[in-house]
Curated annotation (Swiss-Prot):
InterPro entries: NAD(P)-bd_dom_sf (IPR036291), PRISE-like_Rossmann-fold (IPR055222). Pathway: Mycotoxin biosynthesis. Keywords: NADP, Oxidoreductase, Virulence. Belongs to the short-chain dehydrogenases/reductases (SDR) family. Highly divergent. This is Short chain dehydrogenase sirS. The keyword Iron does not apply. The keyword Isomerase does not apply. It comes from the Eukaryota. The lineage of its organism: Eukaryota, Fungi, Dikarya, Ascomycota, Pezizomycotina. GO terms for molecular function: oxidoreductase activity. The gene is sirS. It comes from Leptosphaeria maculans. Residues 306-332 are annotated as: Disordered. Coiled coil: none annotated.
Length: 409
């Protein structure tokens, strides 16, 4: 189909991956966006796209400008996507596309993961081009894996010393061929060649936030469930050992809240004039963290006493011998104990099926890296983004939403 030529009264956003931790935050912040100047407009319409059924998701998004369209499988190709979206009100007015969809199934090998994710970005872009002739900007979110974080876990090194800068080279072989983000960016470069729209890459570390469904990339709820169920079994005040390593316990890193991430991506999308298409930008809350600082704070939110990992030193491990931090204290300790998890759900009147439903990927990715990975924010500052967020407060905010949804007690 050929998109109709229109002049939308104000920007319209299309969000692929709308019910993920980033996508939900994007939709919420797009709806909250206020026009404080000609270059920061209010979005007249926000169209969220997801694959899974959207009923009973507890989105907490009530705005007549918002529509969530489910049943969109990007792996089925652009024609399938167009068929689902073509009747959506305002789809022909889409000006800004936010691509935060991702397939990260544990069953996929590196080659499969790359193939699937490249196919998804192809479908998303080609469908948007067919549906709207007003497309101006596409924002694609990747991650700091482009700097070699995964490579460092497999014996490789980072592409540059911390603070990590966007101009760093790609990781060398064989890790380069295993990185899905490089393939995604190469495909977007190809798809955008000769087009009137531009695209930009956003690179966060771990994202803190609420999402209304189970998702393998949501570290926030996995950490909350880990600590909540641990407190249920071991009691208030029990010491809980950090399930990482002595090296990762002291490494410096940066996280980002879903609101901070969304605000930056919206700022970038609406301040893209004069930028080179394909540019990459780091984003974080702006504070520098270590697990030795964050773990005790997180544990305290659930009535526990956070202590260091085995071998971290006498000070970090103080109190473990008093009981409660020995034995099955790694990230996987709740898995397989269905009886205890069901009892936890019943006694706390939370949604069924969440107890013990933790993400191995999230724990490994956030608690196992042994290299400093602070992100340089110089490029973000150069385009006028000076906002900061507090990481501990971001966890508090997200966990409050999970409690409201009766996922956490």
């Amino acid at each position: 189909m050929s998109p109709s030529k229109t002049t939308p009264p104000s920007p319209t956003a299309l969000v692929y991956g709308a019910t993920g931790v980033t996508g939900w935050g994007l939709c919420k912040n797009l709806l909250e966006q206020q026009a404080d100047s000609a270059s920061t407009p209010t979005f007249s319409r926000v169209i969220g796209v997801c694959k899974q059924p959207a009923q009973d998701l507890g989105l907490f998004l009530e705005d007549k400008r918002f529509e969530l369209v489910d049943g969109v499988d990007l792996l089925q190709g652009e024609d399938s996507v167009v068929e689902v979206l073509k009747e959506v009100k305002g789809i022909e007015n889409v000006t800004h596309v936010f691509y935060v969809a991702n397939r990260n199934s544990p069953s996929d090998g590196p080659d499969e993961r790359i193939s699937f994710n490249v196919k998804m970005i192809q479908s998303a872009v080609k469908a948007a081009e067919q549906l709207s002739s007003n497309m101006q900007v596409l924002i694609m979110q990747t991650s700091i894996n482009v700097y070699g974080i995964f490579a460092s876990l497999m014996g490789g090194t980072l592409t540059c010393p911390s603070p990590l800068v966007e101009s760093a080279d790609r990781t060398p072989s064989p890790y380069r061929e295993m990185d899905v983000h490089y393939a995604q960016c190469d495909e977007l470069k190809r798809l955008s060649k000769g087009k009137s729209w531009s695209w930009f890459e956003v690179r966060p570390d771990a994202v803190i936030g609420y999402v209304p469904r189970r998702h393998e990339n949501n570290f926030t709820v996995s950490l909350g469930l880990f600590l909540a169920t641990y407190a249920h079994v071991h009691g208030a005040g029990a010491p809980v050992r950090f399930p990482g390593t002595p090296e990762s316990w002291k490494c410096k890193f940066s996280m980002v809240s879903q609101d901070q991430l969304a605000r930056f991506e919206i700022h970038l999308a609406t301040h893209a004039e004069g930028l080179q298409s394909g540019e990459a930008f780091n984003v974080s809350n702006g504070d520098v963290l270590t697990w030795s600082k964050l773990w005790p704070e997180a544990a305290a939110r659930f009535g526990l006493r956070g202590v260091g990992p085995e071998g971290a030193g006498e000070e970090e491990g103080k109190g473990e011998a008093e009981g409660g931090a020995k034995g099955a204290t790694g990230w996987s300790w709740p898995l397989g104990d269905e009886t205890t998890m069901k009892k936890w759900e019943e006694e706390n009147q939370v949604q069924k099926g969440w107890g013990g439903n933790l993400s191995e990927v999230c724990f490994v990715n956030t608690m196992r890296p042994t290299v400093d990975r602070i992100l340089s924010l110089d490029k973000a500052k150069k385009i006028g983004f000076e906002a900061r967020d507090d990481t501990i407060a971001a966890f508090d905010k997200a966990w409050a939403l999970f409690k409201k949804a009766r996922i956490l007690p």
